[in-house]
Amino acid sequence: MSNVNEQRATIETPIFGSEKMRNSAPTETIPMHPTSPEIAYQMVKDETFPQTQPRLNLATFVTTYMDDYATKLMNEAIDINYIDETEYPRVAVMAARCINIMANLWHSPEQAKWKAGALAIGSSEACMLGGVAAWLRWRAKRKAQGKPYDKPNFVISTGFQVVWEKFAQLWQIEMRTVPLTLEKTTLDPQLALSMCDENTICVVPIEGVTWTGLNDDVEALDRALEDYNARTGYDIPIHVDAASGGYILPFLDPDKKWDFRLKWVLSISTSGHKFGLVYPGLGWVVWKDKKYLPDEMSFSVNYLGANITQVGLNFSRPAAQILGQYYQFIRLGFEGYKEIQSNSMDIARYAHEQIGKMAPFENYSDDVVNPLFIWYMKPEYDRTAKWTLYDLQAALQQNGWMVPAYTLPNNLQNYVVMRIVFRQGMSRDMTDMLLTDMQNAITEFEKLEYPTQTRVAQNKQQRVVGKVFTHTHVKAGR
């Protein structure tokens, strides 16, 4: 009888009249029998309905809009594995062209036909590759000098993205962190150098700090390192984590020196699926010259029909994102990227100004140097408020927006902030809708007679340990 019902569901029964739609979706075991594609599609699609719509997700840095031609091109390549270079040699060529384009955007001095770089599944893998290269170069030099090489370290601000903590744990490399303060909101070069020694593999400035949106001053760090290395005899290099800024600075601030124009910058990592304007996941890392990419990082296999050499932590990876990146470079060109990033920046600055005018709030920084920023409650308002920024996050989510609230990293953990990332697809009109929803929520909060549960919990936590109440599920994610 069930077979008859299944045939009817497939041929003539409406999807929501089918037996499958009366049953729960599988959660632990694979179903015994096949399901028609129409019903399977609907069941999976229904699972996504309660979620925030991607373009309203202002927590993420990830691209949520590409044009129809880009989407079509990527869909047509969904079955292509990048690593199969023998079968798909043109994909590898396009990846190499993308590396060349980015290397030249970042003023690479390398004269080779193909610049030294690697594809990654995201900026996290790209950071790992840049860090590993610095570690292997340092280790090789220490071995050659007959010196110990068992205690490597690197220096970064407390505004680091979690990948650097993973890097430290996985490769057992000490991470030395330079604290941020309200007065010093980016990496302090002198403090960074005070943490360096003969075991320092690199210093990592960040262009587009995940927590704040600000840029570390790479040029100032480079000048300081020039003097430091000359005095000590060390040759500590810089790896720039430009997950966001790598696709912003070349187009909006081309004269700013943060890249390979600086002596000690030997590698740069970025994300193609953030402001590179490609759907996830895609990252890139470029070295100043092939000599800075250790041979130990290249691995070869011969079981795919030819001898294939690659640099990366992952092996198989989708080719669609490579086609998407190459398409964007061709489709948009320099001026197209500049126009899109300029629009995002202009809208971010507009929102920054409007939120700064709202009675409860104060912006973390007067500057908007990337298309994102953070703000917090004014201390005098916070002392008597019956609500918190976590409540505002929840209220906005009821209207479809995702605007995260979170605590800042160590040394600033008493500050709960909110952040908006302005990406391609976030228009001025949508921004006005968001600002209206924010103001409406604040108006309702100010009518409260009693504090919210989050406010009670936060105040209690402050009295007990002197820290703000933290929603552990809210992250500043990348």
Regions picked out by a protein language model, each given a short descriptive name:
Residues 90, 119-126, 156, 160, ...:
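Secondary-structure capping and boundary motifs in well-ordered enzyme cores
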Residues 95-103, 160-164, 188-196, 314-321, ...:
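Structured alpha-helical segments in the cores of large, soluble enzyme domains
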Residues 26, 59, 82-87, 113-122, ...:
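A short glycine/serine-rich beta->alpha loop
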Residues 159-161, 182-183, 208-210, 245, ...:
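Short, glycine-/Ser/Thr-/acidic-enriched flexible segments
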Residues 1-111, 132, 138, 142, ...:
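Non-catalytic terminal extensions of PLP-dependent enzymes
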Residues 251-254, 258-370, 376-381:
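Active-site C-terminal subdomain of aminotransferase-like
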Residues 2, 7-14, 118-299, 304-307:
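Conserved PLP-enzyme active-site core in the AAT-like
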Residues 177-183, 231-241, 297-300, 312, ...:
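A generic structural motif
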